[in-house]
Amino acid sequence: MNTGRQITIIGAGLAGALLATLLAQRGWRVEVFERRGDPRLHGYAGGRSINLALAERGLHALRQAGTDDAVMRQAVMMRGRMVHPLDGQPELQRYGRDDSEVIWSINRGELNIVLIEAAEAAGATLHFDRRLEQVDFDRSTFVVKGDGHEEKRSFAALVGADGAGSTLRGQMAQVADLGERIDWLDHGYKELEIPPGPGGSFRIEPNALHIWPRGHYMCIALPNDERTFTVTLFMPHAGPHPSFETVPDGDAAADFFASDFADAVPLIPQLEADYERNPVGSLATLTLDRWRIDGRAVLVGDAAHAMVPFHGQGMNCAFEDCVALADALESHDAFEAAFSAFEAERMPNAAAIQHMALENYLEMRDRVDDADYRLQRALELMLQDRHPHRFVPHYAMVSFMRIPYAVALERSEIQRGILQRATAGIEHLDAIDWAAVDADVRSRLGLLEGTPA
């Protein structure tokens, strides 16, 4: 157990507020400094409204903090992807086998407020409208600015939970080489909205993530508890049509949607206005060679490993970070030992989910309406039934279990090879050579720890 029992967190977003809750509940003296105003007074001003997908990893962390009930009251179940092809009827592709294997759509702002209130209830002290300006790591002091004046404070250890543009990370980089690399995706995003239907009802199936896959671009729509959907258009920033360069305004967007997302047009009555009002967002993967400066500072969540949103795991991974760091701080007598153990545990897993998130983008936009993909998905579920302790579908390992991401990635790559070999040159499952496939599974996959008995 760390004997200092004092810690300072920079950032009261999702990860910062959850970590503050977990530590305060364990008796730590926690102070949190947040550059934005209190969202309970001024509304949420996070700059992003992409809905978040809450899966088992994130739910486990919320259970540890005792906030799962409050969060789930606001969540909307998503059973799978509702795929809207260019021609034809929408089709639901389930994430799992039944309603015990689902994910949940949650509003970022509402979730943040629940976690802030939990942190304060646990005894953490939160300071809003306080921007980190400078850190003196040698003297263990930092300066925050707010209300027109600067204030110098001391710290025992700092945790950076201040997002992809982390100010603390910038301060750390001035005194240590973090090996920072930012890989920008050539695709951006723009948000639109499907409002409630007549009588305040959902306009389309609420218990699904809707996706309009179109090759190198796509739309998705996630349900909100106020009967709206947040629609996100992903396509290249520039280049041949369609791109944000070739679809520059509302009129062009109306024509584009009429030709490429025709069934979505009547659902988005403010399409032109939304398109012109909302900015084009950028997407990137952040990697670092180190997340800490000995025992003085450590980074968590997006501040350490921002990722593209296409596996719905950014928040879930950040919440796993919070639990891992809280556990490490309880298990080690010194901050340096705790931060080192945390980094060693989480860094390879963050790298794995970053890789899988990029892979999932290609799957979502290119493959979900592909016949070979659907055949392999059907075989995947059958192999899960035939080998429940060996062959667990990729999505199940990532979203419904808490096995390390790195293990999920390793096994997923093996399983992809099994599926490709089994379906090569065939069009129907009745042509599968089951003896060969079963032997392939047994020879390449060991028993997976944590699978249901």
Question: PLM features: residue spans?
Answer:
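C-terminal helical "tail/cap" subdomain of flavin- and related membrane-associated enzymes
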Residues: T3-R5, D327-A453
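Conserved Rossmann-like nucleotide-cofactor binding loop
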Residues: A15, D38, G165
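Conserved FAD-binding catalytic core of PHBH/FMO-like flavoproteins
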Residues: E117, A121, R130-Q134, R139-V280, ...
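Acidic/histidine metal-binding catalytic segments
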Residues: R73-M77, S259-E276, A334-A341, A350-H355
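Glycine-rich FAD pyrophosphate-binding loop
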Residues: A24-G46
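Conserved N-terminal helical subregion
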Residues: N2-Q6, L54-E193, G250, W434, ...
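Generic enzyme active-site microenvironment
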Residues: V32-F33, H127, G160, V300
